[in-house]
Amino acid sequence: MAIVVVGGHSRNIGKTSVVAGLIGRLPQFHWTAFKITQYGHGFCTANGEPCDCQTDDHTLAVSEERSRTSGTDTARFLAAGAARSIWVRTRVGMLAEAMPRIRKELGLAENAIIESNSILQFLKPDLYLTVLDAGTADFKDSARLFLDRADAVLVRAAENGLVPRWDRVSLKLIEGKPRFVIASPDYMTDEVAGFVEQHIARHCSLAK
């Protein structure tokens, strides 16, 4: 099997659309899709809503999406054609607790695509794509930590010639890496899908 990870430096920059786009354009891989969400204090991992609970049973939740029309990101993955879609929620810094369940689900998958940066602490994917948007100043620590591990960079099309202004981020880490421009609404191109398809095919041939 192949594992593809899609990450990025902030929220709302197209990561979920990239995952859904790859699922839709490469249906032959029968993807199991994972959405990994880490919440800070004051949010419940059971449903992602604000809460005051601090009990141990609210530090981790894993659920499989059953509906294609619920409006969630995991529903988008199913609607795009994923064989299965799984939502993992943990408290910030506690993803390790979810790894036994994640590895179990990976063992059942034909191929997997995971929306996350932090998962790279615990596994080495066959392909890691990072999404960058020069118009968004926020830069997650997890994205900064793993920027040099990206196999390709998906650059969100900038308006008005925006120049990145990210603190403590060295773009030298991605010099020489393949770059693809993506844009709304689907944040996917034939070139990106082809790159992923070729990479997986190469992985599968080496694994034989």
Per-region residue spans from a language model:
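Short, hydrophobic alpha-helical segments
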Residues: 196-208
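Conserved beta-strand elements of the Class I
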Residues: 5, 30-34, 130
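Glycine-rich phosphate-binding P-loop
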Residues: 5-22
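Active-site rim loops that border cofactor/substrate pockets in soluble metabolic enzymes
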Residues: 60, 83-108
